[in-house]
Amino acid sequence: MLQRLSQWDYAISATCLGHRFNVQVARLARVISHSGDGYYYALFGGIIAFTPFAGAFWSLALPAFVIELMCYLLLKQIFRRDRPQALPVFIRPSDRFSFPSGHSAGAFVMAGSVAQIFPSWAGVAFTWASLVACSRVLLGVHFVSDIIAGASLGLLIVYGIN
């Protein structure tokens, strides 16, 4: 059964990759992926600091990000799943292993935190997080199961804290 899931995962990931050979799609996927880099969270946090909800947001988001980072690093070392090497890569990954997706986990921690504190922005936040996750597959650095695991990890942490 595990082998069948792995085959399904690879087939879906390869199909996704087949749709991003357009230069504009690859470029857009890179921009979306980079929007999930950690330093943008600090920038967003600086913006939130000027709202009356800054304390509530950071009391949820900061511990969630710390827990997410620790879990993400631990899981990468436990599973040590290589990135999809047979598939062309369109971005330089930050490390060798793919499971779980740290970008997906972080994006969903941010989206879940935004949704809890600013409910009217939940749709935008989760759409952005989903795009970050999908961009990682389109860029060839993750399998579909990596982003599902990362998104699940991020959400479990945020909603577990709250």
Go through each PLM region and give its residues.
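N-terminal transmembrane-helix/juxtamembrane module of multi-pass inner/ER membrane proteins
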Residues: 1-41, 72-94
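Core segments of transmembrane alpha-helices
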Residues: 36-45, 103-111
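Interfacial segments of alpha-helical transmembrane regions
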Residues: 47-70
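Membrane-water interface at transmembrane helix exits
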Residues: 49, 71-80, 115, 158, ...
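Transmembrane helix-loop junctions in multipass membrane proteins, especially transporters and channels
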Residues: 53, 80-85, 140-145
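Small-polar-interrupted transmembrane alpha-helices in polytopic inner-membrane proteins
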Residues: 63-78, 123-134
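Membrane-embedded catalytic cores of phosphoryl/pyrophosphoryl-handling enzymes
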Residues: 88-162
